[in-house]
Curated annotation (Swiss-Prot):
PANTHER family: LARGE RIBOSOMAL SUBUNIT PROTEIN UL2M (PTHR13691:SF5), RIBOSOMAL PROTEIN L2 (PTHR13691). PROSITE patterns: RIBOSOMAL_L2. Part of the 50S ribosomal subunit. Forms a bridge to the 30S subunit in the 70S ribosome. Keywords: Ribonucleoprotein, Ribosomal protein, RNA-binding, rRNA-binding. The keyword Methyltransferase does not apply. GO terms for molecular function: rRNA binding; structural constituent of ribosome; transferase activity. The lineage of its organism: Bacteria, Bacillati, Bacillota, Clostridia, Eubacteriales. This is Large ribosomal subunit protein uL2. Belongs to the universal ribosomal protein uL2 family.
């Protein structure tokens, strides 16, 4: 989809861009695949803020997405390509031959009227889901499982794709969008192709109000708070943080501090780190 620019009739409009949604299907979402979402403003059951910067925003319904792609051997026709407010990628509504309807993540090149399927014997074509054992080395894939049958957990954001690098024994090696090379069991499923809506990264929000529509509240710097609110707070006038390095509101080191566990069990599946040359 193309990125739209606006005439600078206000300061916010000068740099604001949005996407041209004219290529999406002009239909209401499938009611049987909608679920209600309740907002909690980042509060827990005690009413205390547990996640900062959450609150407000437009009302949304959750679209139930088929990440498992476990309906094997039955072809499905793409009925619509739709906007999903809950994710950066667009979604496609599939009408299966037996009457069932499911949403999937829409890859690049998938159009209304196309047919997709899943299973070991599926064709090597964009939108089809197969075990990694049946996908040719070098293919671009997305919606990758970490455990067989659990459903895709990796590479699900707009414009993303991983590459199947090699197959050795029970594991396949996949290069993720971050550059990390990781081993995944060869009987895990993935979907062929690159996630659509690749222009999403070029959209500029442009104004604070648009972030509020998304349910994102303002972020305040710790150095302008009082000492009771943040370790960086306090002081007379414009003062430094008064520490050797920055910390979070709860006193933990931040900005470059490594937070991954030193001996995480899944480390053995990482062949190459994302920042390794």
């Amino acid at each position: 989809m193309a990125v739209k620019k606006y005439s600078p009739i206000t300061p916010a409009r000068r740099f604001m861009t949005s996407q041209d949604y004219s290529q999406l299907s002009k239909v209401e979402p499938e009611k049987s695949l909608l679920q209600s979402k309740s907002k909690n403003g980042g509060r827990n059951s005690y009413g205390r803020i547990t996640v900062r910067h959450h609150g407000g925003g437009n009302r949304q319904k959750y679209r139930v997405i088929d990440f498992k792609r476990d309906k094997d051997g039955i072809k499905a026709k793409v009925a619509t390509i739709e906007y999903d407010p809950n994710r950066t990628a667009n979604i496609a509504l599939l009408n299966y031959a037996d009457g069932e309807k499911r949403y999937i993540l829409a890859p690049v090149g998938l159009k209304v009227g196309d047919f997709v399927e899943s299973g070991e014997s599926s064709d090597i074509r964009t939108g089809n889901a197969l075990p990694l054992a049946n996908i040719p080395v070098g293919s671009m894939i997305h919606n990758i499982e970490l455990k067989p049958g659990k459903g895709g957990q990796m590479v699900r954001a707009a414009g993303n794709a991983a590459q199947l690098m090699a197959k050795e024994g029970e594991y396949a090696q996949i290069r993720l969008p971050s550059g990390e090379v990781r081993m995944v069991r060869i009987n895990c499923r993935a979907t062929l192709g690159q996630i659509g809506n690749i222009e999403h990264e070029n959209v500029k929000i442009g104004k604070a109000g648009r972030k509020r529509w998304m349910g994102v509240r303002p972020t305040v710097r710790g150095v302008v708070m009082n000492p009771v609110d943040h370790p960086h707070g306090g002081g007379e006038g414009k003062s430094p943080i008064g520490r050797p390095s920055p910390v979070t509101p709860w006193g933990k080191p931040t900005l470059g501090y490594k937070t991954r566990k030193k001996k995480k069990k899944s480390d053995k599946y990482i062949v190459k780190r994302r920042n390794q040359k």
